[in-house]
Amino acid sequence: MATIGMLYICTGKYTVFWPEFYETFSRNFLPGCKKEYFIFTDAPSIAHEDDPAVHRIAQPAYDWPLSTMKRFAIILTQQKALEQLDYLFFFNANLTCREVITPEEFLPRPQQGEQLLLVQQPGFWNKKPMFYSYDRNPRCTAYIPYNCGRA
């Protein structure tokens, strides 16, 4: 059984979304897999924190866009624990899981040569690569020139 790390930042007003996120993902997302929830929050307490799989991590709220820019630094505060997991998923705070998503339909199948799982942000569906938010700075190691990305 795979162990799934659920990365969730809910500071400030976003804490209101946590209970429904937890309930729908616990019920519908990858049934049969062990899930560990890493909740980065400024709330003094959160719903379901009595569940041993819920890890509340104190995190001050940042104004946007700093909250987005510091996302990976925030997540890496838990690097040692995260290295013990098979898969990591970061979720926007307002996401819910309404339908059952099974491991067979979602996780990579190593026996078929699959090693990675990629999820496309819905904002990019049906867009031409020219309009993707690639880094266009030629001095950046992540640089992708216009008309050179892939859908």
Model regions and ranges:
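N-terminal anchoring/stem segment of glycosyltransferases
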Residues: 1-67, 80-84
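Active-site nucleotide-sugar/metal-binding loop of Leloir-type enzymes
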Residues: 73-87
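Glycine-rich loop/turn
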Residues: 69-70, 83-84, 139-141
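Catalytic core and acceptor-binding pocket of nucleotide-sugar-dependent glycosyltransferases
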Residues: 141-151
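Conserved donor-nucleotide/metal-binding helix-loop-beta segment in metal-dependent transferases, i.e.
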Residues: 96-139
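Generic beta-sheet signal
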Residues: 4, 86-88, 117
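Active-site regions of enzymes building and remodeling cell-envelope glycoconjugates
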Residues: 49-62, 72-74, 105-109, 113-115
